[in-house]
Design a protein with these regions (language model features):
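A conserved helix-loop-strand patch within extracytoplasmic ligand-binding domains
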Residues: 111-115, 123
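Rhodanese-like catalytic fold shared by cysteine-dependent sulfurtransferases
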Residues: 2-111, 128, 134-174, 182-255
Length: 255
């Protein structure tokens, strides 16, 4: 039985410097139809964010052509599944590729990227505030040992939590993580703008960690919620047990 690749990738770059967004949208949608790839691509002036699936041949053809359209080189995260967990063709233009609803100076740069192999050392330090930037229903399916749950319903709630609970003078070292890295890539410069200087973020997100770090060495407890029909993943990116649906937003998947 042929397996399907689930491929996620994103990049913060000025897409309007490449091609007008409506044209990019149409070209990518046509490419999805042509190659048979399914999933969602979000476009904004600040960049792109994609979650796609297809056979190995379909994905190879799509990524080769899409890289030319977007004038980039992809660094995708890839996992496998026996069925297509994504079934629609959807290319959207939005104000943001991940919705924070706050001004962010991306030029401040991301935090220090920590490879999965070094992540345990960072979050085991008592001086480190370990921040799960995901939502409450994601946290309850699984998180890193010692991580703090901001109890947010959506990503745009996180700035209010920071304003009420963190102080740059007291919380000098913050290590943050999310599913695949995109939320941290945006939130790290936001926190730098607030005066937090020592920011660390998990390179490749939880997905790369549970793919890379052996279970016996892992500080990850539970399963990782994902935004497709698989629902959750465990170590080695294996589909987890169907979660309690009360742990997620019943109306929509907020990121």
């Amino acid at each position: 039985m042929e397996q399907f690749q689930i491929v996620n990738f994103y990049e913060f770059k000025q897409l309007v410097d490449v091609t007008p967004l409506p044209e990019v949208k149409e070209r990518l949608k046509e490419l999805m139809i042509e190659t048979g790839v399914r999933g969602t691509i979000i476009l904004a002036e600040e960049g792109y964010n994609a979650s796609l699936c297809g056979t190995s041949d379909e994905m190879s053809a799509f990524l080769l052509a899409a890289a030319k359209i977007l004038d980039t080189e992809f660094d995708p995260k890839v996992s496998l599944h026996n069925e297509r967990p994504l079934r629609k063709i959807d290319v959207k233009i939005k104000p943001e590729i991940v919705t924070l609803k706050q001004p962010v100076d991306i030029s401040l740069g991301a935090g220090t990227h920590v490879k999965p192999e070094q992540w345990n050392e960072i979050i085991s330090d008592e001086e480190t505030f370990v921040l799960d930037t995901r939502n409450d229903y994601e946290f309850k399916n699984g998180t890193f040992r010692g991580a703090v749950n901001p109890e947010t319903e959506k990503f745009s709630d996180l700035p209010a939590y920071i304003a009420e609970n963190l102080d740059p003078a007291k919380h000098k070292r913050v290590a943050m993580f999310c599913t695949g890295g995109i939320r941290c890539e945006k939130f790290a410069p936001y926190m730098k703008g607030l005066g937090f200087d020592e920011i660390y973020q998990l390179e490749g997100g939880i997905l790369r960690y549970i793919e890379t770090v052996p279970k016996e060495d892992s500080l990850w407890d539970g399963e990782c919620f994902v935004f497709d029909e698989r629902r959750t993943l465990t170590h080695d990116l294996v589909q987890g047990i169907e979660p309690d649906h009360s742990l997620r937003n019943p109306k929509r998947y907020n990121r």
